[in-house]
Amino acid sequence: VVDGVAVRYQYGGQAGAPVILFFNGLEMQEMWMPYAEKLGKKYRFLIYEYPFHTTNADEQIDFAAKLLKALSIEKVILIGASDGGVYAQIFAKRHPESVLAMLLTTTLTVDSDYVRDIRKERFSTPILLLLLKLVPAKTEMKLLLKKSTGFLACESEADREYGRGFYETVASDLHYKQRFIQSFKCVYMLKDYPLFKESDFEYLRGKIQVLLPEKDIFKKEDQDRLADLFGKLDAEILHGPGGHVGFIVQSA
């Protein structure tokens, strides 16, 4: 329990090793399990469900910092994917005393067309949120599974099969509807977040890695902006085959 809020989390791995803190998108914490199984042989890891009490990005991240304190974790290595990559950047900016290094994969930064497009939906988003709340959970999960087919179109057959199984498993839990709506709200709140500056991450110079898939769901221009921001900080920028889902659900 942190600030009176019950937290569901998994904390395991190699005792005494550096701790990896995972940030994910769409409230799909399950995506990190293949990574935890592999990295847990050398590192400690922490995966947690984002709390429902706030959709404000800074408050969400400060809550994560309080969770670390409650677990007596002083330093972490950040790994963020999809929208979770933006959360990792916010954590690195707000809590530099807690960060050893940062890895970002198949993600972007606040200075992106993705976020600018969200700003254009100021009037339509509240209506969409209302509809999401009214639609029965089973129907909403079927729609999510149908939409996931588009995410998987550019993946290899092996990754498509893995991705389908992953989405089906997540959607089989009808309680995921509330997590999905919460995630939708949190992403919408990023629309007004201030742009990051190079100085925000100067302390991590040479300790940042950015992994970019060849066929990401995010625009190449957004990938380039992310690479430009961290390339100035001597980050290792790596490009690889595959798409958004393949990078996330497979731990390679």
What are these regions (language model features)?
Residues 113-115, 137-200:
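Conserved alpha/beta-hydrolase catalytic His-Asp/Glu region
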Residues 217-222:
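Conserved alpha/beta-hydrolase "acid-adjacent" motif
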